Regions:
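Short acidic-hydrophobic, aromatic-tinged amphipathic segments that line or gate anion-handling sites
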Residues: 4-6, 107-111
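Solvent-exposed, non-membrane alpha-helical residues enriched in polar/charged side chains
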Residues: 7, 11, 35-36, 59, ...
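C-terminal capping/lid region of NAD(P)-dependent oxidoreductase domains
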Residues: 16, 20, 92, 97-106, ...
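Glycine-rich beta-to-alpha transition loops that act as phosphate-gripper elements at the mouths
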Residues: 25-28, 103, 107-109
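A broad detector of short, well-ordered amphipathic alpha-helices
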Residues: 32, 111-114
Length: 134
């Protein structure tokens, strides 16, 4: 699928106004079409790039009047532990209130925790993997 076709598919999924926030955890050939589908004054978050480091025409940011921001989660947790703790607490509150429902794709008993790690390392995990201690 070419960039324009992929961008049109993203736009169709987001609606005519486009996406207010793009959370790009893939990168590579998917980043430019995602940026093309962003709404006016949207926000594009660069989180990861397992598909490769994207090369995008930056004039799209001007045409969309949008922002691109890098999100380095590991550094954030180390540099701003108080904010990190507050955000985790807020996420758990939202989950408890039923406002968000994280995708748990698989649950492992503690003795199979290594299998969960192997699945993460091989990028086979979809959603969250949970290791239980019962």
């Amino acid at each position: 699928m070419c960039i324009r076709d992929r961008a049109n598919a993203f736009k169709a999924a987001c609606g005519p106004a486009g996406a207010n926030i793009v959370y790009d955890i893939v990168g590579g050939q998917y980043s430019e079409p995602a940026l093309r589908s962003i709404a006016w004054e949207g926000r594009f978050l660069v989180v990861g790039f397992p598909a490769g480091i994207a090369k995008m025409p930056l004039n799209l940011t001007l045409l969309k009047s949008c922002d691109i921001a890098g999100v380095f989660w590991g550094a954030f947790t180390a540099r701003e532990p108080v904010k990190f703790r507050q955000q985790v607490e807020e996420l758990f509150d939202l989950m408890k209130a039923g406002k968000i429902d994280p995708l748990v794709s698989e649950t492992f008993p503690l003795e199979k925790g290594g299998d969960a790690i192997a699945k993460l390392e091989s990028r086979q995990a979809v959603g969250k993997l949970v290791v239980t201690m019962d």
